[in-house]
């Protein structure tokens, strides 16, 4: 792995969430640091599910009712750094203080969330988001997450180079079975349990173009669905403002010098 890729991947973080309120019951997901105190992830990683698998149509509507109940307590959402994370053993480097996501209780076309953290994270990359242009079929992306890749060792960060965007919603792929809403796209290379919320990075620029939402078996190609980040540019702007506010409050309370924030999109 090149030094540039190592730095880029350091910005992909593990997220441990106690969805049932019991700190000993932690669900592992992935996310991306998009400001020193702001993480991008999937909403199903930080909200309690009431259905096992969303059933969606190409308009982004649910065919099996509401998917989510309330949000997890932000203080029970931890962010972990490093290439190998074991949430039952390791200590989080930060906790969430606020969760931002689309309204409603449906994951279809809306499985994205931002976490404002209680402290800035240093020594890792802050990854840019591509908010001004959608992803296109045929593009190459680099999925990164803590599903372990081909070894399927959950908690090990892995990437899949040159994954191809097979389709962009609204569409239904008869070959793979993927049904995509207007804000979703499908890649060919498998994502695994633990990769949820992890980013797909533009192979050329390193910008985040989507986050893992749902998918088929880890061992098969196709039907791996991402939510586009450009479709939620306004939510991203709100999240950056909340992160900046938290930084100012932290500075005022502790009289510390803040880490530089990336420019708001």
Describe the residue ranges of each PLM region.
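Conserved catalytic-core segment of clan PA serine endopeptidases
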Residues: 2-8, 19-23, 28, 55-122, ...
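Conserved beta-strand and immediately adjacent loop positions that scaffold enzyme active sites
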Residues: 12, 30, 111, 140, ...
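C-terminal subregion of chymotrypsin/trypsin-like serine protease catalytic domains
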Residues: 27-28, 33-47, 53-78, 160-166, ...
């Amino acid at each position: 792995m090149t030094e540039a890729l190592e730095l880029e991947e350091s910005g992909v973080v593990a997220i441990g969430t106690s969805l049932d309120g019991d700190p000993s019951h932690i669900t592992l997901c992935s996310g991306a640091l998009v400001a020193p105190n702001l993480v991008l992830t999937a909403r199903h990683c930080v909200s309690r599910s009431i259905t096992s698998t969303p059933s969606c149509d190409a308009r982004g509507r649910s065919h099996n009712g509401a998917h989510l109940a309330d949000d997890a307590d932000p203080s029970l959402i931890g962010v972990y750094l490093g290439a190998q994370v074991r949430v039952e053993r390791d200590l989080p480097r930060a906790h969430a203080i606020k969760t931002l996501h689309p309204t409603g209780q449906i994951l279809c076309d809306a499985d994205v969330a931002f976490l404002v953290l209680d402290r800035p994270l240093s020594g890792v990359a802050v990854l840019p988001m591509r908010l001004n242009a959608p992803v296109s079929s045929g593009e190459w992306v680099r999925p990164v997450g803590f599903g372990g890749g081909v070894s399927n060792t959950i908690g090990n960060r892995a990437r899949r180079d040159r994954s191809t965007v097979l389709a962009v919603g609204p569409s239904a792929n008869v070959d793979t079975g993927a049904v995509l809403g207007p804000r979703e796209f499908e890649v060919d290379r498998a994502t695994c349990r633990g990769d949820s919320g992890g980013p797909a990075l533009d192979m050329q620029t390193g910008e985040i173009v989507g986050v893992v939402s749902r998918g088929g078996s880890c061992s098969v190609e196709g039907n791996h669905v991402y939510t586009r980040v450009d479709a939620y540019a306004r939510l991203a702007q709100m999240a950056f403002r909340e992160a900046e506010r938290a930084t100012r409050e932290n500075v005022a309370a502790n009289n510390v010098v803040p880490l530089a924030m990336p420019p708001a999109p």
